[in-house]
Amino acid sequence: MEISDILFDDLVVGEINDDFICVICSHLQVDIYQCVEGHFACKNCFLKMIELKKQCMTCRCEIKSIESLSKNRYLEKEVRKLNIYCPNSFSDLKNSIKDENACKDIITIEGLETHLKNCKFTLKECPNNKNCNDDNKNKECLKIRQGEFDHHLKECPNSLIKCEHCSIEITRSKQTDHIENHCLKVLKQCEFCFKLIERGEFNNHQDTICLSKLIKCPFNEGGCVDLVKRSDIKEHLSVLAGEHLLYSITMINSLSLKLEKSNSELQESISYSRLLKKDFKELKKSKSYSGRWVIEKWSEKLKQYGKGQSIQFQKFNTSTSPSSAFSYFTLRLFPNGQYNGETISIHLVKLFRNKSRISFSFEIENHINPSSNEEIDSRFLFGNLNDYYSTIFYKEYNKENGFISEDDTLVIHFNVEILKYYDDTFITK
C-alpha cells in the first residue's frame, strides 16, 4: 500500500478542521502547496491547474510550474498531527467497511509510513508468484497479511523445493505428481523379477536386461511361436536346434523376398527421381528467357532519342507456353540515359499483374574483346502491372573501346528468370 494512494478523509479520528480541506477537491490535504499570494491547495490539484491554465484558481496569478510554488509547512505540520485509524483496520477501505478482526491501532498521519512497515495486518505479495507460468499452470497466491507471511512461505504451494530423489527443483504443489509419475530416480518394482529399478531405467531393464521376462524366440518370424524366459533362451535354441534350422531357412527365404521387393521399390524411386529432375529442369526453363537485342545505326539513335526518351523492345514470354499470361515482359532502352549522369539505361518492364521476384541480367557486347563485355546482374521484387526496374550503365560506349561495332551496331544480351510468384490479396471492407 502506497501512502500517496490513501484518501485520509475517512481515516481521521474525530472532526476535520475546515482549514485542512483542499478548496478544489474537498479532500483532506497532506501535501500542501501555495501560490505567491498565499492561496493553498493540495499538490494534485495544483498540478491539474498548471496543466490547464497555469494560474492560481483564486487570485489568477501566474504559475509556471510546481517548482515555482512554495510549501505551507505550518499547515502540513498540523495536518500530520491528526490521529487516524490504521488503513488495515478496514476490509474495504474505499467503502469504509471496518474489519473487527484487523488492526485496531490509532496513529498519526506522520507515523503512518513507519506503522505500515511493521503492522502485521499489512498485505504483501507472495514472492513465489514468479514461479507461476503456463508450463506448470500454478495459480498465484492471494496477498498475505504480514503477520502470517513467514508461516505462508513455509507452506506456499508455489515455493521451489528439491525433489528428495532426483534433486530437481519443482514447486511444492507439483511434488506428489512429480514423485508418482515423472521422477526418473523413484524406484519401481519389476513384475517379472521383482527387483526395484529406477523409473528412468525401467523400460530398458524390461526390454533388454530382465532375465525373468518372457520374450519371443529369435526365430519367431521363421515360425517358432514359443515364449521363453530371457535366462532360458540359449537352452531353448540348443534343445530345438533342428527345428530352428528349418525356421532359419524360412527366415532367409522371407528376407530374400523382402530384399527383392526393396530393390524393386528402390529402382522405382530412382526412376521417379530422374523424372522429377527432368520436370524440374523443364519447369525452370519455362520461367526463364534469354535473348539478344541488336540495335543498328547506333549513332543515329543517339541523335534521334534525347535524354529520357526510349526505344521499345518487342514483347517476350519467359514461358514455353504462348498462352501463359503470367510471364510477359518488354524492354525499354534510353540511348542517352533517363537522367543526368547516365549513358545508357535499360528498363525491364513486367506486363502481368502478379507480384513476382525476378532475376535478370544485361550484358553489353564488346566486339574487340569479348572478355571485356560489361554485365550487370540484378534481383528485384516487382509489384503490379507495368512495374519496372532500371539498370544503369555509366561508361562511354563507342567504336574505339569496342562496344560499338564497325558497322555502327550495339548488341545487348539479356536473361530474365521468374524466381517466385506471389498470390494476390483481396480485401473486402
UniProtKB/Swiss-Prot annotation:
PROSITE patterns: ZF_TRAF (PS50145). The MATH/TRAF domain binds to receptor cytoplasmic domains. The keyword Zinc applies. This is TNF receptor-associated factor family protein DDB_G0267744. It comes from Dictyostelium discoideum (Social amoeba). The lineage of its organism: Eukaryota, Amoebozoa, Evosea, Eumycetozoa, Dictyostelia. Keywords: Cytoplasm, Metal-binding, Repeat, Zinc, Zinc-finger. Probable adapter protein and signal transducer that links members of the tumor necrosis factor receptor family to different signaling pathways by association with the receptor cytoplasmic domain and kinases. Pfam families: zf-TRAF. InterPro entries: Znf_RING/FYVE/PHD, Znf_TRAF. Belongs to the TNF receptor-associated factor family.
